Amino acid sequence: MAQVRELTKGGVHHAFEVLGRKETAEQAFAMLAPGGTATIVGMIPFGQKIELHGFDFLRERRIQGSSMGSNHFRVDMPRLVEFYLRGRLHLEDWISAKLKLSEINEGFANMKAGKTLRSVIVFDA
């Protein structure tokens, strides 16, 4: 977080946590500038709590949740598909690993351990 605060000369105005991990939610909040907002999009496991320092709220920092990315499926999904088909949305860049069905257990273990973020099972044609 120190490097982010240094590069931005005091922190970011908006930070988005999208992995669903306790550590990255805490990091998103820690890198905020005074008055900044951290939005938690990722699904942090049920029952897991994040830890924040009360002092940081004196700097008017905020943290908020997001339900399903606050999307509107009927409007957003057709637009996202169109962006993908036109080459404006590069979904392949979001894939950490491509797996065979026989590797699913290893892939799940890697995801759970934080070694990969998004795996895709590839079936032979």
Where are these regions (language model features)?
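C-terminal hydrophobic helical "lid"/dimerization subdomain
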Residues: 6, 10, 14, 26-30, ...
